[in-house]
Swiss-Prot record:
Coarse class of the protein's main subcellular location: cytoplasm
Protein name per UniProt: Polyribonucleotide nucleotidyltransferase
Lineage of source species: Bacteria, Pseudomonadati, Thermodesulfobacteriota, Desulfuromonadia, Geobacterales
Binding, Mg(2+): 484, 490
InterPro entries: ExoRNase_PH_dom1, ExoRNase_PH_dom2, ExoRNase_PH_dom2_sf, KH_dom, KH_dom_type_1, KH_dom_type_1_sf, NA-bd_OB-fold, PNPase
CDD domains reported for this sequence: KH-I_PNPase, RNase_PH_PNPase_1, RNase_PH_PNPase_2, S1_PNPase
Organism annotation: Geobacter sulfurreducens (strain ATCC 51573 / DSM 12127 / PCA)
SMART domains according to UniProt: KH, S1
GO molecular function (one): 3'-5'-RNA exonuclease activity
């Protein structure tokens, strides 16, 4: 097979998409490269759907090979193991924009695999993998309603930048990933430093315009190397069976979807389903999934019709009303900060814990090791939706929701120089009926304020929905779980009163327009301000005092050439301080020393020990020292730990001294005065000049 390539200029760099050389037995395979970053992306679909398959089984796996960064994996086995959080999140980034673009009747097992085989620090392999997923599907025989492309948008010095470098991202006040087709935006995810809704919208559509050349390049590649698409049979509908199901269940479902309580509503729909199956299965044996499909279609139709035509939702709210909110803080006595945030039937128990630099997370990536001092972990136990399941590690959804909430809050976390703590937020979802990640954002801000973290401003989050039927459009504030399931969009926005800190959009239709997104952003702002008002009533500002169970961190500075004196040979000195006081000590290369302890007395003792280790003698100053060694010509007196000076025999007394031992012996405490320091740093001390003097307090 001949190799085909297309090149496209993108953000001042050249992206190359090639096919026909690697992985030729896959349904579709491309190699996407930019600079020294190279990603292989393959797409494979089974020849037919499994028997009884009633959903689309798409899986996306993104993996960064250690050799791509010139590294050997750590650990005993020395090979790549379970996916990192970054790999999991990137897999989700790739999945979300392509999932709605497969034909509804295509239910074959489909797998996208993106493998990073070379990586530099300037070209994001995740973005190349997203482009590659679309391109691999385009050149394959798999039916796909693409192409799409992705871009990361930053803003440096007020100017939007495509796929910013690491250096540019450090200066950027905005970082948003946009996936789009020719006509519409399909997925958005990112964060910003309290950006206005207008700026966020501009960034999104800057990204939409930027990806158009890549979309065209994929079309060109398909013309060069694509194969004919598979025929997908339209789903056949048994109209007679559909009519029977409608006659039996439609009226009951119409009443059921207006029941406000989630469990009661689901129970009633479950009863209607059971009754319908009991009536029809004797006649239509083996067609249970088909009957359930019709029931689901009727529920979908009735919920959407009620919203579009009547302007009212499942629980009776109009499109802009937020569910009732209740908030408690400080419920957990031993947690450093805690909050219980309840919005309707969604409830999050959120706790914040303060730690030291020892508690920072160390992350090993292709580009080396980094450290992370702000962590947020989101847990979604099965009981929160009245279910049971076997739980081990957090799933992709939990990792994704946690990262979204973390991104929303990290922009208001104080800098390390101002608040030298590691901060961990844990959100346990106790009940869920929509928008649990946004409840986590609200609860996380409240828990940090309760812990005394001086955050820049409170942050609230809200999930928006969309119902689009023909020309009829309804944008919903604070959506329920069923509205998420039956709607066309899940659009989450978090931020402060000043602006947006995080955004995420997923859609089930082929795209949303600028007008819809603008209206959703402005409606989300109104909802966010309402929620912030409720949060302000619970706790208006961060507490001025930390929890008595939180470590107190005191910062002192020493000269950089004194760091080795604090540490000591083999860590002897610092180990001695921690053992004697029970404190935790972190020393930075700059000479900054953070001392953490729940006891002020222990902290003060540790500071004194460090000051003693790093103190320097000053000429003319008095010191209380200890005689360490007696010689014929004088005595060596230690004035600080590890620092001593010589009291010459002539400086022992105003009278002539014949033997040093007549005045001083080893172990004696003696008040001395520093009378000089020579060029070699040797200290000259005098007992004679200190006679009659009193050591200052």
């Amino acid at each position: 097979m001949t190799e085909h390539k297309v090149n496209v200029e993108f953000g001042g760099r050249t992206i190359t998409i090639a096919t026909g050389k690697w992985a030729k037995q896959a349904s579709g395979a491309v190699v996407v490269s930019c600079g020294d970053t190279v990603v292989l992306v393959t797409a494979v679909a089974t020849k037919s759907a499994r028997e009884g398959q009633d959903f689309f089984p798409l899986t996306v796996n993104y993996q960064e090979k250690a050799y791509a960064g010139g590294k050997i994996p750590g650990g005993f086995f020395k090979r790549e193991g379970r996916p990192s959080d970054n790999e999991t999140l990137t897999s989700r980034f790739i999945d979300r924009p392509i999932r709605p673009l497969f034909p509804e009747s295509f239910l074959n097992d489909t797998q996208i695999m993106a493998t990073v085989v070379s990586a530099d620090q300037d070209n994001d392999p995740g973005i190349l993998a997203m482009i590659g997923a679309s391109a691999a599907l385009e050149v394959s025989d798999i039916p796909f309603l693409g192409p799409i492309a992705g871009v990361k948008v930053g803003r440096v010095d007020g100017q939007f930048v495509c796929n910013p470098t690491v250096e540019q991202l450090e200066k950027s006040d905005l970082e948003i990933v946009v996936a789009a087709s020719r006509d519409a935006v399909i997925m958005v995810e990112g964060g910003a430093a309290e950006a206005s809704e207008k700026d966020v919208l501009e960034a999104i559509f800057f990204g939409h315009a930027a990806v158009q050349p890549i979309i065209e390049a994929q079309t060109d590649l398909r013309k060069l190397a694509g194969v004919p698409k598979r025929e997908v049979a339209a789903t056949s509908v048994d109209e007679a069976l559909k009519t029977r199901v409608k006659d039996l269940a439609y009226a009951g479902i119409k009443e059921a979807v207006r029941i406000v309580a989630k469990q009661e509503r689901h129970n009633r729909i479950g009863e209607i389903t059971a009754q319908t199956l009991e009536t029809l299965l004797p006649e239509y044996e083996g067609r249970e999934s088909e009957i359930k499909g019709f029931l689901g279609d009727f529920e979908y139709e009735l919920v959407r019709e009620h919203i579009i035509k009547d302007g009212y939702r499942i629980d009776g709210r109009d499109t802009t009303t937020i569910r009732p909110i209740s908030i408690e803080v400080s419920m957990l006595p031993r947690a450093h900060g805690s909050a219980l945030f309840t919005r309707g039937e969604t409830q999050a128990l959120v706790a914040s814990t303060l730690g030291t630099s020892i508690d920072e997370q160390r992350i090993d990536s292709l580009y080396g090791e980094t450290r992370k001092r702000f962590l947020l972990h989101y847990n979604f136990p099965p009981f929160s939706v009245g279910e049971t399941s076997f739980r081990l590690a957090p799933g992709r959804r939990e990792i994704g929701h946690g990262m979204l909430a973390e991104r929303a809050l990290e922009r208001v976390v104080p800098k390390h120089e101002d608040f030298p703590y590691t901060i961990r937020i844990v959100s346990d979802i106790l009940e869920s009926n929509g928008s649990s990640s946004m409840a986590t954002v609200c609860g996380g801000a409240l828990a940090m304020m309760d812990a005394g973290v001086p955050i820049k401003a409170p942050v609230a989050g809200i999930a928006m929905g969309l119902i689009k039927e023909g020309e009829g459009i309804a944008i919903l504030s604070d959506i329920l779980g069923d509205e998420d399931h039956l709607g066309d969009m899940d659009f989450k926005v978090a931020g402060t009163e000043a602006g947006v800190t995080a955004i995420q959009m997923d859609i089930k239709i082929t795209g949303v327009t600028r007008e819809i997104m603008e209206k959703a952003l402005l409606q989300a702002r109104d909802g966010r301000l309402h929620i912030l008002g409720k949060m302000n009533q619970a706790i208006a500002a961060p507490r001025t005092d930390l929890s008595p169970y939180a470590p107190r961190i005191t910062t002192i500075w020493v000269k950089t050439d004194k760091i080795r004196d604090v540490i000591g040979s083999g860590g002897k000195n610092i180990r001695g301080i921690t053992e004697a006081t029970g404190v935790s000590i972190d020393i930075e290369d700059s000479g900054r020393i953070n001392i953490a302890s729940t006891s002020k007395e222990a902290c003060d003792k540790a500071i004194k020990m460090i000051r003693d280790l790093t103190a320097e003698a000053e000429e003319g100053k008095l010191y209380m020292g200890t005689v360490k060694k007696v010689m014929d010509f004088g005595a060596f007196v230690e004035i600080f730990p590890g620092t001593d000076g010589l009291v010459h025999i002539s400086e022992l007394d105003t009278e002539r001294v014949k033997n040093v031992t007549d005045v001083l012996n080893e172990g004696d405490k003696v008040l001395v005065k520093c009378i000089g320091i020579d060029k070699q740093g040797k200290i000259k001390l005098s007992r004679k000049e200190a006679l009659g003097a009193v050591l200052p307090e």
